[in-house]
Amino acid sequence: MDEERMERGARDILSGVRDHGREEDGARCTPSYAQGGIMDEKRIERGVREVLAGIGEGCLNAEVLANTPRRVAAMYAEFFEAMEGDPADALAVVYQEAYEEMIVMKDIPFFSICEHHLLPFVGKADVVYVPKEGRIVGASKLARVVDVAAGRPQLQERLTSQIADALVKRLDPHGVLVRIEASHLCMTLRGVKKPGATMVTSAIRGRFYKDEAARAEAFALIA
C-alpha cells in the first residue's frame, strides 16, 4: 500500500470539492458560497484514481479501476449539492405573525461529511428561536437550513454555529439555540473504534445566552 500516493489523491479530492471553511494555517476563511466556487468532478476522479492506485491496483478489477472514480465523483456531487448555498437563504421567505414565544423544531435528522477523514457523521439537530417583531419562517425551512449547512465537508462544531448564525442573519430573533447530537464514522471505523459514542454540541445566541431561565426552558423542551 502506497500511503503517499493515497495522500496525493486525497488532496486532489479535497481540491476538487473546493474550499469549505478553513485556510492552510487553520484560520477561518470565507465559505465557498461567498466565493462562488464550483465543484471540479474531474479532479475528484483523478484523486480517486490515485487513492485506488495507492491501495494497490493488483487488488482491484478492471471495472472498479475504470468506473469507481466516476461513481465517487458523482456521489460527492450529490452529497455536496448544497455547498454553494448560503444556509441563511433557506430562510428567505419570512412571515409576520403576532407571536414572540419559543418555537422549537426538534429531532431533525441529517448527515454530513467530516472534513478530516471524508467519512459521514449522522445525527439529529434541535433548533429553538424566539421571534422578534413577529418574524417567523415555515417549519420546513428549519429542516432545510440544517440540510444546506450540512451539505458540505464539515465539523460538527462549525455546523452547529452556522445553523444558529443563519437564523440570526435572516430573522434577527430575540434568541437562538441549536443543539446537535451525532455519531461519527471516523470514530466507529478507525482510530479509537468506539461505535455508539455520540458527540453533543450547542450554539446559543441572544436571549438564551443571557437568560439562564430561558436557556433552561429551551433545553428542557428539546430533552
Regions inferred by a protein language model and the residue ranges of each:
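A domain-level signal for the structural core that forms small-molecule/cofactor-binding pockets
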Residues: D2-G16, M39-A223
